[in-house]
UniProtKB/Swiss-Prot annotation:
GO terms for molecular function: ATP binding; ATP hydrolysis activity; DNA-binding transcription factor activity; metal ion binding; sequence-specific DNA binding. It comes from Azospirillum brasilense. The lineage of its organism: Bacteria, Pseudomonadati, Pseudomonadota, Alphaproteobacteria, Rhodospirillales. This is Nif-specific regulatory protein. NCBIfam families: nifA. The gene is nifA. Residues 205-433 form the Sigma-54 factor interaction domain.
Length: 625
């Protein structure tokens, strides 16, 4: 080669290297960058049909950029280690030159495009692409000649090796950035997952107490999966709200959320509602009806109060849960379904299984992930935020300004709330309707209106009785426990014979003797809503008075003389001391009313200020719950 021509070629190669370096640093799109490099090689140095292959994570060499091929066609081309000329370059890590591709048996021609050469001769030059001494790909180009194969390709090999080194550094940089980005995304996801329990409340779930925050953390953990969830808790704790939160945070959030209250439907109707029925299956079935399992396919089915379904229907439900298929009532066609099941109950299922009222196999089928919702009395930190939430909700729904005094909130904090959050919401709504100037004060609350029997209901339930649909305590002690007043229950023999009254809450055995007082007659105090007799204790109930009056206690009878016969015991509410110091009576009243001074004052016929003064005088510490 003449010296002038060699100098011209060297200058052109230097200019091309400069252009390639600019291209490699101009874009973050690796494929687009490599295609621009191949175009520059073809334009500047007539290096045609440039190809860049990169090794994937599976060690397969894939075509990522090709001059003259579409992205779709290039994506289909790959080579194994040692396969063809390109695979051999990958395996050996050494350049390869093929002077005449038409005479090379190892040439596979997978990329095509050389059929129109006629009398021209195509030569191939390929070099490995290395990064940090490791082969990460292959760069190949074609040389087209009209005069037969060229005899010397040394300058092309040296030049392409420099280009391949630049490409290798760029590939390494892109892969490092991509790996760091994936790592940062994983770390971000992990940190978000850990911080979710203290994130913003889910929908209307208002909570700040540690035990409810743990429930929320459990909701976040279980939501992404299809596992069956059993939500347990007393009535009014918000089981449906938690079920909706699980659905809304799951991959099924855009699919239906179907709720069925199993306790509200008889067995025959429940089967039709869940499985559907065919036309003519029974009287009144005038058309085909899709069941809830069919409607909820792809979404979530929430079975509320599942502990109340009959043992007969439990067997039918078990088959659907096991096989995810069912038949409509009156039909024979098997229907497949794909539902995420969430169940809820306020009953002690373990006790029901032990008594044969709930199938053990169904219990184990639904008891996969269990979420226990604490009662409101065990999450008192939430009473204030919940009360303010319900006040704001009532104000918004009714288009008014409404606030609550701190003193009223303090009264709410001392209540036992056997009806839990639902009872609190009702209490706020009732108090809001009684407020005249948009301020909920203490006198607006049910306690001041003598309409609250929370403490009485709480004592009934904790002793094992079922009052007004409120389930007994679900703790281990609830199993095989006999409620008071029933045969075998505590103090059953001494229970007073008072018809048309709720069963009294008995005093624990030995409690009277421990206080140094003789036992006395006990008369239950009527619950709110029961009609009371007029003053004097005789005559029919007064239908116009639905709640107990705020009457003072009966006067204390003077002590009888030793010779006189003892007078009949005075009828006092529950086990109020008939005699003794004011301190004893004050302690009794505070214990009976959950340490709410306003209630204790009404029970003793005193004012709230008198009760507060007496508590300070006798140095009685107020219990906080």
């Amino acid at each position: 080669m003449p010296g002038a021509m060699r100098q011209s070629t060297s200058n052109l190669e230097l200019l091309t290297i400069y252009e390639v370096s600019k291209i490699l640093g101009s874009s973050l799109d690796l494929q687009q960058t490599l295609r621009e490099v191949l175009r520059a090689l073809a334009y500047q140095l007539q290096m045609h049909r440039g190809r860049v292959y990169l090794v994937g994570e599976d060690n397969v060499l894939r075509l990522v950029a090709a001059n003259g091929l579409s992205n779709e066609a290039a994506a289909q081309i790959e080579f194994r280690d040692g396969e063809g000329i390109t695979g051999r370059i990958l395996k050996t890590g050494m350049p390869a030159v093929v002077p005449n591709l038409a005479e090379e048996p190892l040439f596979l021609n997978r990329t095509g495009g050389r059929e129109d050469l006629d009398e021209q001769v195509a030569s191939l030059v390929g070099v490995p692409i290395k990064a940090a001494g490791v082969v990460v790909g292959v760069l190949t180009i074609d040389r087209i000649s009209d005069e037969g194969p060229q005899g010397h390709f040394g300058s092309d090999v040296r030049f392409l090796t420099m280009v391949a080194n630049l490409i290798g550094q760029t590939v390494r940089l892109h892969r490092t950035v991509a790996e760091e980005r994936r790592f940062m995304m994983r770390e971000t996801f992990r940190m978000q997952k850990e911080l979710r329990p203290v994130a913003a409340p889910i929908n209307d779930v208002v909570c700040t107490s540690p035990n409810m925050l743990e429930v929320m953390a459990q909701v976040h953990r279980v939501a992404p999966f299809k596992s069956t969830v059993l939500i347990r808790g007393e009535s009014g704790t918000g089981k449906e709200l938690i079920a909706r939160a699980i659905h809304n945070m799951s991959p099924r959030k855009d699919a239906p959320f179907i709720r069925v209250n199993c306790a509200a439907l008889p067995e025959s109707l429940l089967e039709s509602e869940l499985f559907g029925h065919e036309k003519g299956a029974f009287t009144g079935a005038q058309k085909d009806h899709k069941g809830r399992f069919e409607l909820a396919s792809g979404g979530t089915l929430f079975l509320d109060e599942i502990g109340d379904i009959s043992p007969n229907f439990q067997a039918k439900l078990l088959r659907v849960l096991q096989e995810q298929e069912f038949e409509r009532v009156g039909g024979s066609k098997t229907i497949k379904t794909d539902v995420r099941l969430i169940c809820a109950t306020n009953l002690n299922l373990e006790e029901a299984v032990g008594h044969g009222k709930f199938r053990a196999d169904l219990y184990f089928r639904i008891n996969v992930v269990t979420i226990h919702l604490p009662p409101l009395r065990e999450r008192r930190q939430d009473i204030g935020p919940l009360a303010r939430h319900f006040v704001a909700k009532f104000a918004k729904d009714n288009g008014m300004a409404l606030v609550m005094e701190d003193e009223a909130l303090e009264v709410l904090n001392r209540c036992t709330w056997p009806g839990n959050v639902r009872e609190l919401e009702n209490c706020i709504e009732r108090a809001a309707t009684q407020s005249r100037d948009g301020i909920i004060r203490t006198e607006s609350l049910s306690c001041s209106l003598n309409l609250c029997n929370s403490s009485v209901l709480f004592q009934y339930r904790t002793l094992g009785a079922s009052v007004g649909g409120l389930a007994p305590s679900m703790g281990p002690g609830a199993i095989n426990r006999v409620p008071p007043g029933r045969p075998g229950g505590p103090a059953a023999a001494n229970a007073p014979k008072t018809p048309a009254m709720p069963a009294p809450v008995p005093e624990p055995a030995g409690a009277a003797a421990a206080r140094g007082r003789p036992a006395r007659r006990v008369v239950p105090r009527p619950l709110a809503g029961l009609r009371r007799r007029p003053a004097g204790g005789s005559g029919p109930p007064d239908p116009a008075c639905p709640c107990p009056s705020r009457a003072p206690l009966p006067p204390q009878a003077p002590p009888p003389s030793p010779a006189a016969a003892p007078p009949p015991a005075a009828e006092v509410p529950l086990d109020e001391p008939e005699s003794g110091s004011l301190r004893d009576r004050l302690l009794w009243a505070m214990e009976r009313t959950g340490w709410v001074q306003a209630k204790a004052a009404r029970l003793l016929g005193m004012t709230t200020r008198q009760v507060s003064y007496a508590l300070r005088k006798y140095n009685i510490e107020i219990k906080r719950f």
